[in-house]
């Protein structure tokens, strides 16, 4: 067997089982940039940007449907990603529909048509009826 190079002879094996991920140079500089110097040379911490999610709404719906059931963080992240994806698809389709008819405003009609195009059959019908109900409730000002 050939001898190991001198540079790796004294090092421990490269096991990553219990190690945290190694930060790259870009990540190190990004983490350092969170601190900016103030007027007196003191260091100020930047506020964390808030990540907007649908998790509180998903949780409320879960408790309405199954009051005794919980949800893991991973499942919540998947559902949040799903909601973002569906909303993005509907918005993109509604934008295309508005541009086809040379309109600069997306109305409830474009949203409804987008839902019909994106969601399959019965799911689209239920989504449209619930959406219409919500818009009517909002317009009337009732809780």
UniProtKB/Swiss-Prot annotation:
Assigned keywords, A-Z: Acetylation, Chromosome, DNA-binding, Isopeptide bond, Nucleosome core, Nucleus, Phosphoprotein, Ubl conjugation
InterPro entries: Histone-fold, Histone_H2A/H2B/H3, Histone_H2B, HISTONE_H2B_site
CDD domains reported in the protein's UniProt record: HFD_H2B
Record flagged with keyword Endoplasmic reticulum: no
Biased composition (Low complexity): 23-39
Cross-linked residues, Glycyl lysine isopeptide (Lys-Gly) (interchain with G-Cter in ubiquitin): 137
Region span, Disordered: 1-52
Chain coiled-coil ranges: none
Post-translational modification N6-acetyllysine, affected residues: 11, 19
Glycyl lysine isopeptide (Lys-Gly) (interchain with G-Cter in SUMO) cross-link, renumbered residues: 11
Subcellular location: Nucleus; Chromosome
Annotated GO MF terms: DNA binding; protein heterodimerization activity; structural constituent of chromatin
Modified residues (Phosphoserine): 15
GO cellular component labels: nucleosome; nucleus
Post-translational modification: Monoubiquitinated to form H2BK123ub1. H2BK123ub1 gives a specific tag for epigenetic transcriptional activation and is also prerequisite for H3K4me and H3K79me formation. H2BK123ub1 also modulates the formation of double-strand breaks during meiosis and is a prerequisite for DNA-damage checkpoint activation. Phosphorylated to form H2BS10ph during progression through meiotic prophase. May be correlated with chromosome condensation.
Cited function: Core component of nucleosome. Nucleosomes wrap and compact DNA into chromatin, limiting DNA accessibility to the cellular machineries which require DNA as a template. Histones thereby play a central role in transcription regulation, DNA repair, DNA replication and chromosomal stability. DNA accessibility is regulated via a complex set of post-translational modifications of histones, also called histone code, and nucleosome remodeling.
UniProt family annotation: Belongs to the histone H2B family.
Quaternary structure note: The nucleosome is a histone octamer containing two molecules each of H2A, H2B, H3 and H4 assembled in one H3-H4 heterotetramer and two H2A-H2B heterodimers. The octamer wraps approximately 147 bp of DNA.
Protein name: Histone H2B
Species of provenance: Agaricus bisporus (White button mushroom)
């Amino acid at each position: 067997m050939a001898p190991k190079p001198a540079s790796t002879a004294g090092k421990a094996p490269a096991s990553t089982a219990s190690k945290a991920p190694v930060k790259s140079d870009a990540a190190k500089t990004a983490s350092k940039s969170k601190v900016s110097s103030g007027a007196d040379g003191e260091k100020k911490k930047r506020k964390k940007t808030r990540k907007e999610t649908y998790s509180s709404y998903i949780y409320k719906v879960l408790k309405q449907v199954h009051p005794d059931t919980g949800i893991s963080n991973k499942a919540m992240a998947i559902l949040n990603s799903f909601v973002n994806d569906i909303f993005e698809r509907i918005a993109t389709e509604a934008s295309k529909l508005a541009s086809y008819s040379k309109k600069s405003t997306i109305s409830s009609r474009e949203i409804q048509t987008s839902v019909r195009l994106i969601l399959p059959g019965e799911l689209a019908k239920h989504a449209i009826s619930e959406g219409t109900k919500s818009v009517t409730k909002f317009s009337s000002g009732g809780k």
